Amino acid sequence: MDYKDTINLPKTDFPMKANLSEKELEILKKWEGLYEKLRAQRKGKQLFVLHDGPPYANGNIHIGHALNKILKDIICKVALIEGFDVDYKPGWDCHGLPIEQQVEKELKAKKINKESMPKDEFRRLCREYASKFVSIQKEEFLRLGVLGDWENPYLTMDPKYEAQEVREIGRCLQNGVLYKGNKPVYWCIYDKTAEAEAEVEYKEKKDISIYVRFELLKQSENVLRQKLDLPDKPISIVIWTTTPWTLPANLGVMSSEDIEYVVVEEDNYLLLLEKQSQYVKNKEFIASLKGKELTGLEYQHPFIERTGKIYPSEFVEAGTGTGFVHMAPGHGMEDYIVGLRYGLEPFSPVDESGRFTEEAPEFIRGLNVFEANTVIIEHLKQTGFLLKEEEILHSYPHCWRCKNPVIYRATPQWFIGVDRAITSHFASCEDEKIDTSDVKKLQNKSIREKAIEETYNVKWVPKTGQNRMLSMLQNRPDWCISRQRFWGVPITIFYCKRCGEPLLESHIFEHVAKIFESSPYGADEWFKKDEKELLPPDTVCKKCGSKDFVKETDILDVWFDSGSSHASVLRPRGIEKADVYLEGSDQHRGWFQASLLESIASYGEAPFKSVVTHGFTVDEKGHKMSKSQGNVISPLEIIKEYGADILRLWVISEDYTEDIKLGKSILKRLAEDYKKIRNTLRYCLGNLYDFKYEFSIAPDKLHHFDRYMYAYASKVFEELFSFYKNYQYHRFYHRLMEFVSIDLSALYFDVLKDRLYMYKSGSFERLSAQTVLYFLLKNLTILLSPVLSFTAEETYSYMKSIENHLPESIFMNEYKASDFTDEELLKDYQKLLLLRKDVLKAIEIERKNDIIKHPYEARVVIKPNEEFYKLLEKYKDYLHSFFTVSQVEIAENDGEEGEYTKLRIKVEKAKGEKCPRCWLYVETMINGVCPRCSQNI
């Protein structure tokens, strides 16, 4: 007789082969409008806000974008299954130099000169370019399975956004932290603009360092000779520099009051420098003195008719250079700080292209600063002032956009003063949108002080992020927020034509903001309209009474653009702080810091409760991905071959706080892991075709093995959910794979097959197992949904035939922890599982010895000890099923001792006949089958 039709073999339409690249497209169509439905469903629940750090609207998305957006999506979806009303509004950074450069490139191809084009027309082209890539990237992000308010993203070029930035400038001015100053800033001579600290990256650079002597004036020589017994030769101080091109801007020399300086004799002159300098190694010291005795001595510039003085400075360290640092306040921040102290105005004879101006010596005028290095060195050599030159490799700032070296250059710029006390700048506030109430909480603290204080109120993931941010805040200079470009939000300040006084009244900023937000052109109106059209009627200079004004031509730093997003995106909707900001670890000095500083400057508090950072993507060997190396992998190519869910699984497969490896072999391994997860879901569905949720048996009434798995899985699910909530996604992944592969596939599912297949539909034995299978399926699907979103939604569609009245989408469900436990049973099974390991090992040995071919052919004899005797007696009727053998006997035997339990275990040939239906060996048959099968046909 053929018993096949009497066996409950698995049945499901849930395919074994995922075919994700096609199936996901179907699911994406179903998700249209889902975000809006979720917001409606969760209305009134506690709000959870992840504020999106805006990617740049240029080019297609790369693997770093995918990592970033998927991590954000996982966080949001975890909040969804936790029961929150999740607010995620994607954004784009739309202004800035890269877009300008791309538009310029397109214009050049058409032989159109940008300079001949009206600024508002050029800005229109930039806007169109950004819009194009917003649309492209939006579709690519959607393909990753990211849920969000994609119909209403925020764009930094949106008129309302730009208008709010104008208000933020007003708040910063009102709070006394925004000022205009002539001071050195990072300057890219190729892009011809100032750059913020966050826009430079340090790279190794070869340069020529030089030792140069500066001759002391006779009067200063005499001062030294009165203190020291010196030969009658000219005295020179020695400076060491790696930037010879800054020598034309030299206005002084810094020394240290605490360093010991020495005099050495060389050729026809005496040299004065610090005792530890490499230059005086193995030279005889004629005399020595402390640095404080050098203050005020004067020297002659080596090639300019200019004298300078020696000034004490905390920036001079022993052991580096010569103990004397040449000071060019127009080309160095430390130089500027010391110069300011002693009344030295910044001097920079270099234009925006990095070429020396008419203020420089004739022999270098018109030269690029880097070209001038060799010319200056040669000049010093010929005039006898060069003592030594050598090549060095040092860390030097480069423009993060064009990758060229930048310089420090003093120019008039707008700054946010990080050490300025935040107090109301105005006697009164004329507009409710620019108020002073937030400032009261600051108690006259500076931005730096308040920012440092706020870092302790923020949760940092990983924790090292806090120290990184603190280090940057403690050492950063004032924030230069002005740029000399076209495509950005203008700094909306007017100057009196007659006396140059700026208009700083708050109502003027509000007036301009309203013009921007009421126009489809937004900030372009600044370039379209003249001053009278932009100013309130009858505006008068309070200083001189003039009615004629001129507009500021600089635009805002793009970091101010994105850093003020909290004010443009969150606060108008009543959200003072986002729950999470998440970006790459480079954003500590970028968006995180810009957001923190801008928020404190305007509102006196951090805009975020938590900051999560991720590492960067590298290839399988740990190398940085680059086109030149040929190791770049496109996320879109991965999706095409494997599907987005494999990419999403990759994101949690390693510790994302470190750099994450990606390559073909890694993707293949992940595809295998995905199959294990999918087969787990399929096993559950396949064995639930005749089950309904209402058939479920109460946990405490289940078969003891099912009861064990229910209690054990409840703990595992809580563990997994805890990993989610603590952002420990790689731990979630490894525990998930362990649970799926070992606890379910190798144990529970393996043991369960016999009971599921052989017992009647509707029987207690089958229903008990099915109750747990559905419990596993539902909880696994919900817990998988933040990561394997497409697969979870696909699985969920099959669950609707099992449980009535399920919500439309898996994401409309909440994870609810089970409070069921049975500690005694869990302890019993801990021991039984150890015994199972020993039994399976013994069976495998006998299979290799050809004693048995299949576990069902085995009879296992176990000799119990005192610890195991009661346990084996308690479960003796179930042990054969648990070990997947035909028979188990508790008796004396001469078998080998088990590794885990130390019990003697012997495997023999099972007694009796093989049941043709269940394949178990039994000693009694009824109507040609075993007694159990005879009752289940």
UniProtKB/Swiss-Prot annotation:
Main location: cytoplasm
Species whose genome carries this gene: Hydrogenobaculum sp. (strain Y04AAS1)
Cofactor: Zn(2+)
Sites where the protein binds ATP: 627
Function: Catalyzes the attachment of isoleucine to tRNA(Ile). As IleRS can inadvertently accommodate and process structurally similar amino acids such as valine, to avoid such errors it has two additional distinct tRNA(Ile)-dependent editing activities. One activity is designated as 'pretransfer' editing and involves the hydrolysis of activated Val-AMP. The other activity is designated 'posttransfer' editing and involves deacylation of mischarged Val-tRNA(Ile).
Gene Ontology cellular component list: cytosol
Positions annotated to bind Zn(2+): 915, 918, 930, 933
InterPro entries, sorted: aa-tRNA-synth_I_CS, aa-tRNA-synth_Ia, Anticodon_Ile_BEm, Ile-tRNA-ligase, Ile-tRNA-ligase_type1, Ile-tRNA_ligase, M/V/L/I-tRNA-synth_anticd-bd, Rossmann-like_a/b/a_fold
UniProt subunit comment: Monomer.
Protein name: Isoleucine--tRNA ligase
One biological process term in Gene Ontology: isoleucyl-tRNA aminoacylation
Keywords: Aminoacyl-tRNA synthetase, ATP-binding, Cytoplasm, Ligase, Metal-binding, Nucleotide-binding, Protein biosynthesis, Zinc
UniProt superkingdom: Bacteria
Residue interval(s) of motif 'KMSKS' region: 624-628
PANTHER family, A to Z: ISOLEUCINE--TRNA LIGASE, MITOCHONDRIAL, SOLEUCYL-TRNA SYNTHETASE
